[in-house]
């Protein structure tokens, strides 16, 4: 990879922190959210061409909808459950949890707590939705270890809920380089990510990410 960066996925990061694995000298993680069909159409061939891997976090309700009524349109279509399972099996994509149906911007921003919502009501809503997605992923042979916050909207308490449900990590939308620390599982939560707007070239994006 350009500049000797090597792609890793969440399994690599988790193994490193737990003392069960190593990371390359210059690790980088490619992440794709929502589960768009164009990840299969365009990204998979490129990952194969350049011998890379990536993390894909689909929204379960979108996957259900397009499984019931497939529409392989690269502009707006989403992947089916069968396609997600095939991507996981390919070894190029690692599938994670992006909520079942908490990807909205109405009274609740993503999976965050609504204004005036009690702590217990929020815990129930968040955990029920997350567990529903976990069960669907598992039904299709996918065991997600990481929660990818919709819109990066994070509320107090959600991290504890994720740990109680057995998650080992979470991805935020905070634009920062993450530091993983061996023996410190907390360093796997709210990992930073840099959004790549279409208007930037790869060179411009890398300069922004590295602070050059």
Residue ranges and their predicted role:
Residues 1-31, 37-38, 94, 103-212:
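C-terminal active-site subregion of NodB/CE4 polysaccharide deacetylases
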Residues 84, 93-102:
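Aromatic-lined glycan-binding groove of carbohydrate-active enzymes
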Residues 3-92:
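Active-site beta->alpha N-cap acidic-glycine motif
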Residues 60-62, 99-101, 153:
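Active-site-proximal loop/turn and secondary-structure-junction residues that shape catalytic pockets
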């Amino acid at each position: 990879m350009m500049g000797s960066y090597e792609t890793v996925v969440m399994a690599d990061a988790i193994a490193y922190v737990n003392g069960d694995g190593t990371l390359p000298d210059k690790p980088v993680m490619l992440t794709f959210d929502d589960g768009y069909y164009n990840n299969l159409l365009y990204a998979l061939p490129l990952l194969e061409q350049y011998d890379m891997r990536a993390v894909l976090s689909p929204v379960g309700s979108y996957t259900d909808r397009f499984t019931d009524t497939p529409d392989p349109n690269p502009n707006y279509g989403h992947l089916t459950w069968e396609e997600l399972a095939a991507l996981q099996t390919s070894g190029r994509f690692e599938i994670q949890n992006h909520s079942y149906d908490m990807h909205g911007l109405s009274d609740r921003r993503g999976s965050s707590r609504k204004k005036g919502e009690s702590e217990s009501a929020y815990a129930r809503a968040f955990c029920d939705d997350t567990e529903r997605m976990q069960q669907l992923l598992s039904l299709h042979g996918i065991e997600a270890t990481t929660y990818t916050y919709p819109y990066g909207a994070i509320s107090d308490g959600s991290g504890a809920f994720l740990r109680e449900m057995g998650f080992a990590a979470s991805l935020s939308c905070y634009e920062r380089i993450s530091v993983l620390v061996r023996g410190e599982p907390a360093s796997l939560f709210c990992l930073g990510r840099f959004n790549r707007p279409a208007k930037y070239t790869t060179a411009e994006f890398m300069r922004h990410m590295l602070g050059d």
